[in-house]
Amino acid sequence: MAEPETCDLFVIGGGINGAGVARDAAGRGLKVVLAEKDDLAQGTSSRSGKLVHGGLRYLEYYEFRLVREALIEREVLLNAAPHIIWPMRFVLPHSPQDRPAWLVRLGLFLYDHLGGRKKLPGTRTLDLKRDPEGTPILDQYTKGFEYSDCWVDDARLVALNAVGAAEKGATILTRTPVVSARRENGGWIVETRNSDTGETRTFRARCIVNCAGPWVTDVIHNVAASTSSRNVRLVKGSHIIVPKFWSGANAYLVQNHDKRVIFINPYEGDKALIGTTDIAYEGRAEDVAADEKEIDYLITAVNRYFKEKLRREDVLHSFSGVRPLFDDGKGNPSAVTRDYVFDLDETGGAPLLNVFGGKITTFRELAERGMHRLKHIFPQMGGDWTHDAPLPGGEIANADYETFANTLRDTYPWMPRTLVHHYGRLYGARTKDVVAGAQNLEGLGRHFGGDFHEAEVRYLVAREWAKTAEDILYRRTKHYLHLTEAERAAFVEWFDNANLVA
């Protein structure tokens, strides 16, 4: 039998936390392997509300530390990846029967001041009868508030962390479940099997970090044959996508009768993303889907506030994700903490660091603190480095995306503006690697519809572990929303026959 490949840190899970840990650790000089059983971000991390935010509603549950840390991270990430993260203004129509105005004002005051806000504008009060933001809102709502948060392309955030990890020397394995992990001589023997090829590999790792998200306890019990007193609480969150039904770049946040809040955000130009629900989930994470009751719930919440009424047939697409929240014993799924918790098991001198909970916004800090927990295992590793480091594509002067975008348009005068915008927003400073020297549209290869060309496909396969048409259409990009059914089918057929994937 071949000698196992050696590494310092073996990361299980290719969602945002796993990719973040792999990048952080590799940048400290550790030899890192990450294994993901499906595609990067295929689980929870591509099915979020796509916000980098402090979490305004968490203030009601007195999560002041969590909100403060998330607000601080919001600015860090805005600087690190201004191409995939950008500021958004949220309009909150005031509904007196749901929360008194003084309470909303207090929450927004705290939100403005808890995190040392530097870049984003503060809160302002709106007269919905006079201010243009009130135009689509029903006349019964006369007062509102406007505040700042940030938007993020969640699946690309994961992919860019994985790219960043690989550029620091990490090995990234997708569609590669860990089939077994056992302690041996103060370390771990980890066996993986590639689902596509059947190839098995064996690694000798000093330490495992379990970032399996909804599957974290499966890994603890069934893969590592370990135990933990901690647990996750699975909470299902569903979103719907509809045609955008208001003018303006602002988003809306509405209060529902059940005290939950619903985001109504501009999405992919001419669409709107509406969510989320919060429902305790008992099923397999792989099987999660938005049900009719949830879709009706979201439509009803929107129709309470807007003049234009959504109907079921307006729903273009829906998706659902399972949030693996740390089980803090709270009964109400909305009240369960969004904070993260580490559980370090050093049985036999072979450390297993299990990660419970967390949210997109705090992934970088989670990774950094996770590495602090392992400092005694790797005393020679480098120090913290990610706070001021751009993510791949985010190497943009002063994190000034607008100036960068103008330069990009000047660089590629032959490109339609929508295509320059698409490349700039997904790839940032790496756009030149996607274009790969092309001098005209024909140089980008086959055109699949919309702003979708062959050069982008080849880049994603070569640089971002895209293995299937679905990986590209739904996660590395959102082309599925901009192609006709016939165009999608034609691309899938072309991709399946092009033999691009080694």
Curated annotation (Swiss-Prot):
Q: Which PROSITE patterns match?
A: FAD_G3PDH_1 (PS00977)
Looking up InterPro entries in the UniProt record yields: DAO_C, DAO_C_sf, FAD-dep_OxRdtase, FAD/NAD-bd_sf, G3P_DH_FAD-dep
EC class, as a word, reads: oxidoreductase
Which Enzyme Commission numbers does its entry carry?
1.1.1.402
Q: Where does FAD bind?
A: 8-36
- Transmembrane feature ranges: none
Keyword presence, Chaperone: no
User: What induces or represses this gene?
Assistant: Induced by erythritol and repressed by EryD.
Q: Does the record carry Oxidoreductase as a key word? A: yes
Q: Which GO terms describe its biological process?
A: glycerol-3-phosphate catabolic process
Q: From the UniProt record, which GO molecular function terms apply?
A: glycerol-3-phosphate dehydrogenase (quinone) activity
Pathway listed for it is: Carbohydrate metabolism; erythritol degradation
Q: Which UniProt keywords apply?
A: FAD, Flavoprotein, NADP, Oxidoreductase
Which reaction does this enzyme catalyse, per its entry?
A: D-erythritol 1-phosphate + NADP(+) = D-erythrulose 1-phosphate + NADPH + H(+)
What cofactors does the UniProt entry give for this protein?
Answer: FAD
Family that this chain belongs to? Belongs to the FAD-dependent glycerol-3-phosphate dehydrogenase family.
Free-text function comment from the UniProt entry: Catalyzes the oxydation of D-erythritol 1-phosphate to D-erythrulose 1-phosphate.
User: Which named protein is this?
Assistant: D-erythritol 1-phosphate dehydrogenase
Species this chain originates from? Brucella abortus (strain 2308)
Record gene name: eryB
